[in-house]
Swiss-Prot record:
InterPro entries: Ribosomal_uL16, Ribosomal_uL16_bact-type, Ribosomal_uL16_CS, Ribosomal_uL16_dom, Ribosomal_uL16_sf. This is Large ribosomal subunit protein uL16. Belongs to the universal ribosomal protein uL16 family. The keyword Mitochondrion does not apply. It holds the Pfam family Ribosomal_L16. NCBIfam families: rplP_bact. The gene is rplP. Binds 23S rRNA and is also seen to make contacts with the A and possibly P site tRNAs. It comes from Acholeplasma laidlawii (strain PG-8A). GO terms for biological process: translation. HAMAP family: Ribosomal_uL16 (MF_01342).
Amino acid sequence: MLMPKRTKYRRPHRVSYEGKAKGRNEIINGDFALVAKEGAWITNRQIEAARIAMTREMKRLGKVWINIFPHLAKTKKPMEVRMGSGKGAPDSWVAVVKEGKIMFEINGVSEATAREALRKAGHKLPIKVKIVKRGEEA
């Protein structure tokens, strides 16, 4: 699973996923990409599931770029613990994805294969996504 090697603070503040993405909203590496149509927190397990779905559909051909990384630690208090007594322990890691962010890019396979691989990856994510081709993103 993806997670940072080390962080400055163990329990960070929540980061909002409202609004549009400021950076990484154009295709840079691949020919096809998966773009977020809404904002959300994407967990490291969801990113890994999408990556596996893409590489299996592509039969290990081509190249995949993952442009999101789970930097944000989500905390959780144990079951049946009363309110208060500080913030909970880090539980999982999430990537903050805003609308318009390019999450995955693919290169080196046919258009039909790329679209099917990205469609399957989109089913693993908790948000609406759009498949775009280089030069057609906007």
